[in-house]
Amino acid sequence: MEPDSLRSYYNMTGAKGSINSTQMIFGSSNQWFSPANLASFQAWAYSPVIPAVALIGGHVNDTKCYIHSFCAEANLDMQYIMTMSPYSPTTFWYTDAWFNIFLQEVANTAKPPKVISMSYGAYETGMPAGVHTSFDIEAVKLGIQGTTLFASSGDDGVSAFFARSDGSKCAYDPVFPCTSPYVIAVGGTIVSLWIF
């Protein structure tokens, strides 16, 4: 979906961000971010071509993206957050650490961002309970500092991936960290073509 369509659909036509509304993308799972791809996307979307202000943890490389799946998630996240809020300084932070460790590291920075978007997740039942508790504690610490956390409900929502091929195998298996009470859980947007 084009950024302008999202702006119109959610009535965000005037939202452009500002220098004080910092934002961060959580990168993981061996996904690469391509600054050149971001610039191309911004130009395509008629958005100001503004680079990320900070790249932490590596996994930033234009040449790795010759295979789409190497960069799909990281590029999508950076493209849309920076097009929807182009004047907000944006950081890409890559780590293979658990979500709670990532939040600890961010909370220990001099000035945590105002918004963190995490489109990665893991089935809640497969994670150690200690990770949930530690994540919640770190999320509260960031919240006190003024940071809002957004987390994806995953590609399958709570139905789990078994339902992809067989709807009768639907199960209740939500994705963490969107199940934390200290994040805003974000589901998918499906819009019928006739609306536009």
Q: What are these language model-derived features?
A:
Residues 193-196:
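Short acidic, Gly/Pro-enriched loop/turn segments at secondary-structure junctions
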Residues 1-188:
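Substrate-binding/charge-relay-adjacent region of secreted/lumenal peptidase catalytic domains
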